[in-house]
Amino acid sequence: MLINKCNQDAQGNCVKSARVEDALARLSHEDSKLGVNMLNAAVAGAVVARQPADTILRAEAAEAWNSIRPVIARHLTCEEDIVLPWAKSLKDFPPDLILRACEQRQRLCNLGRIVDAVSFITGTDEEVTKAGTALTAFAVCLDDLVDCEERDLFPMIQRALFGESSGAGA
C-alpha cells in the first residue's frame, strides 16, 4: 500500500514537472517574440501621451496595446496557475525570485487595468494621455519582467527541474 502511494506521488510529481516544463518552454518562446511589440507599445504610448488629439497616434497606440495584451494575459495566467505555485511548493526555491515575479506581475496587472479602462480611439485627451503613459510604463515593466525571467527565474526553474529528474532516477 505504501509503495502504491509512493508511486502515485512520483507520478504526480512527474506530471507537475512536465506541466512546468511545457509552460516554461511556452513562456520563453513568448518572451522572445514580445521584443518588437514591447518597443512599439512603449513608443506608441509615449507619443500619444504627448499628442493625445492625434487620431493616427491614438490608433497606433490601440494597435500596439492590442498586439501585446492577449499574449501577456496568457503569459501571466500561465505563471500564476502553473509556474509560481510549483516554485512555491519547492523547499529550496529562492523566495526572493518568487516575490519579485509576484510583485512585477502585480505591477503589470495594475498598469494593464489603467490602459484597459480607456479607449484610445474614443477617450478624452486627458484619458488618452493617462493611458498612453501607463502603456509606456507597462512596456518598460514588461521588459524588466522578461529580463528577470530569462536571467534569473527560468534558469532556476530549469535547475530545479533538472535536479528533480536526476534525483528521481537515483
Regions found by a protein language model. Give the residues of each.
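Small-residue-biased structural context
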Residues: 1-170
